[in-house]
Amino acid sequence: MLARSARLLHSAELAANAIRAASGAPATAAAAEASFPSTDDVAAKTKKTGNRIKTFEIYRFNPEAPGAKPTVQKFDVDLDQCGTMILDALIKIKNEVDPTLTFRRSCREGICGSCAMNIGGQNTLACICKIDSDTSKSTKIYPLPHMFVVKDLVPDMNLFYAQYASIQPWIQKKTPLTLGEKQMHQSVAERDRLDGLYECILCACCSTSCPSYWWNADKYLGPAVLMQAYRWVIDSRDDYATERLHRMHDSFSAFKCHTIMNCTKTCPKHLNPAKAIGEIKSLLTGFTSKPAAEPSAF
């Protein structure tokens, strides 16, 4: 997994260099740093002309600059000329003020999880987080906490996705199954057990708000991955619940959760990862067991 990630990063670097060469962009780190807008340039482009000017303080980090250190840069945005969400402000700043501002985004509807970041001290999605209309206070925007930063508001998600892959998030059967031959039956009650679990969009807001995950990310799976693990353990169509639980039966994978509840408080989809982790602990300790699958009528 790590070797594959290294190859992907190397390929991405080669692709980036090719794009720079084709577009005439600066190829060296020093040239790249020099091409970034200065504070004076930003101030000139964000001249306060409206009545509802909002200041955004945004975390900046350029890994291509020699000896780069994180900084916080201020941008003024006229709310009368901007959409209502934080992502609207970020896009406006990138399009009209500073094209070097870097962040992830995709669906703009709270479905993909790409634009997860820390806004005003709370992990959330920029696309569904409304701009505070109080112009007397600035809004602070940082990347997800306790993650390596790729650039600006872009965190490195490699470890998070590697942990997700480790739980084998797909249905596994012990009996031969030919796709299309028959349906994998679920009763209404069995399907209802997945509600509040399958809706997770893997944005990592919960995991990166968890102190246990901050200090033990190499061993503790974290709220998001554990909730996904429970989703597959409890699925009536899956035959490998025992094996899935066995892989988590140690002192760190699940039991490092101290029920701090930050995960449930911050989830932008209003899910309850802490409850799912509690259910996993009950299964691991033998207090509860997975309900037997109902007989199939198919």
UniProtKB/Swiss-Prot annotation:
SUPFAM superfamilies: 2Fe-2S ferredoxin-like (SSF54292), alpha-helical ferredoxin (SSF46548). It is found in: Mitochondrion inner membrane. InterPro entries: 2Fe-2S_ferredoxin-like_sf, 2Fe-2S_ferredoxin-type, 2Fe2S_fd_BS, 4Fe4S_Fe-S-bd, 4Fe4S_Fe_S_CS, Beta-grasp_dom_sf, Helical_ferredxn, SDH/FRD_Iron-Sulfur. One of its GO terms (molecular function) is ubiquinone binding. It catalyses: a quinone + succinate = fumarate + a quinol. Keywords: 2Fe-2S, 3Fe-4S, 4Fe-4S, Electron transport, Iron, Iron-sulfur, Membrane, Metal-binding, Mitochondrion, Mitochondrion inner membrane, Oxidoreductase, Transit peptide, Transport, Tricarboxylic acid cycle. Its EC number is 1.3.5.1. Component of complex II composed of four subunits: a flavoprotein (FP), an iron-sulfur protein (IP), and a cytochrome b composed of a large and a small subunit. This is Succinate dehydrogenase [ubiquinone] iron-sulfur subunit, mitochondrial.
